[in-house]
Structures are given as C-alpha cells and as structure tokens.
Amino acid sequence: MPATPFDSVHLSRLFDAGETARLFTDSAEIRAMMIVEGALAQVQGAQGVIPELSAAAIHRASLECQIDPVSLARATGANGVSTPALVAAFREAMQAPEHAQYLHWGATSQDIQDTGLMLRLRQALTGFVAQLDQVLAALAQLAQTHAELPMAARTYGQHATPTSFGAQVASWGWPLLELRADLQGLLDAGLPVSLSGAAGTAAELGADPAALRAALAAKLGLRDPGRSWHTDRARVLRIGDAVTRMALALGKWGEDVTLATQSGLAELRLGGAGASSTMPQKQNPVVPSAMVALARHAGGLNATLQGA
C-alpha cells in the first residue's frame, strides 16, 4: 500500500484531487521552475544584465527542453534542494555552453522554487474559486427548493427548535461564500515573485535589482513584493490557512450529512454509492466521510506548515 491514499491507484477516486493534482507533481514543479528561469533570462537580457542573444536562447530552451525528474534524484539527495540539479541538467540539455553559462544568473534556489510554487498556487486557487462557484450554485438551488421543508435543528446532537432544510443547506454555503471571496482576494492582490539572490540582498542581480524584480513579476503575472521574503513565510501561510478553512467548512458539511443519513434518522438519502460487502441494506455515506477525513488531514497539515 502506498504511504498516502493520494498516491494509491485503487483509492484515487475516493480522494480525487481532480485537475489540482496535476499541479503538484514532480514534472509540474520542474516545468514551473523552468518557466521562471526562462522569464528571468528574458528580463535580464532586456536590462543588459546578460547578453540578449543568450537570454533568447535560454528562454527558448525553457519552453523546449524536457528534464526527467528521475535524473535529479541523486543530486537533490546530496544538495537538499532540487534547483542545483535542475540548473545543471538544464545547462546540459541546452547544448550551448556559451549561452547556458548565463542561466540562473544571480538567482538562488529559493527564488526559483518559491516563484515556481506561486505560479502553481495561482492555478490551484483559480481552480478552487471555479469549483466553489459550482458548489455554491448547487447549494443555492437546493436551499431555495427546500426553503419551506421543516426539520429539527440540533444543538449538542439533541433536538432544539424547528428549522428548515433550506436553512441547513444555507449554513453549509455561508462559510464557502466567504472563503470564495478570500481566495479571490488572494488572487486579486497577486501572488508574490521572489528574486533576492543568495543572501536576500539582490547584490548579484545587476545595477538595478528592484527594476529587475519588478520586470520579472510583470513577465510572470505575479506581484512585486518590494523586498525579499526568503525568511517571511506569511504569504505561504495565508494561502495554507485559506485552503484549510475551505477543507474544514466542507468537513462540517460532511459531518452533518453523515448524521442525517444514519439509521433511525434518515433525514437524508444519498445516491447509489456506499455499498457494504456483507449487509445489503446499508448505504454508507462514503463521500461525506471522505470530506470529514480530508478536513482533519488538512488541519494537521496546516499545523505542520505553521511550524515549518
């Protein structure tokens, strides 16, 4: 069995990350870092930091060269990060040492990895917003349809006062609506580029490193943070917090549905999934249970991220 269910073939549909999964593979990480290297060379060539001919060659190679993740494993194990191995493999793949010598000029590993991560997170957050729009539209329709359908509200698992199923559905949607606004706010503010060099001073990046950083941000569609953020992970933590809150809101939804489908209540009935191997009368709340499990998993990961 794989170490995590996300790497399992037979569990892949139970914990299906959909299109998001393709953004967090070795190949996607390498491709994002190569895009950053190519864009960096372009802006350095435009500002005279490296020869324009070499800049064009590096940018073209960043779009054409293919780097096998397996080829980076040994050097990454020795160096602790993958960027040195990637740069070496990239230079070799270019087969033009007169131009390849200017690859990664003045940058440091963290610049390339952080900026590549922001490119992938921007795609992920954009996807989350689109998915939330679909979920919210479905919840709105369900809440409107059942606005007058009475049911018992519960506190501490006990009957409280009358409510409606439409109100229950709306309670699932409100946190997601706020999270949708928060995620869009992160995108509107712009995810930050990183270009500060080995010690965060940008001393190796030419006569005007601030202009170079701003140009790289514009080229990649990212935001210029105006400074180094090598040791300030607040930006990453804010993204992690928003995604965790989304998982927790979905987990609460899953808990409510699991409660409402249990024997003796049967306030809700799910679709045809959730079969038992020995008890044909059962219809297990599989998807709601997965939502709860993922919420708990996300909370633990966020705690790890906060301490990283």
Locate each region found by the language model.
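A helix-coil-helix interface module used to build multimeric assemblies
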Residues: 2-196, 202, 208-215, 275-276, ...
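Structured ligand/cofactor/substrate-binding pocket environments in proteins
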Residues: 31-36, 237-263, 267
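Short Ser/Thr-interspersed hydrophobic loop/turn segments at strand-loop and sheet-helix junctions
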Residues: 91-93, 254-258, 295, 299
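A short, charged helix-loop
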Residues: 214-230
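Membrane-water interface at loop-to-transmembrane-helix junctions
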Residues: 234-239, 287
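Acidic/histidine-rich catalytic neighborhood
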Residues: 266-284
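Long, amphipathic alpha-helical stalk/connector segments used for oligomerization, subunit docking
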Residues: 297-308
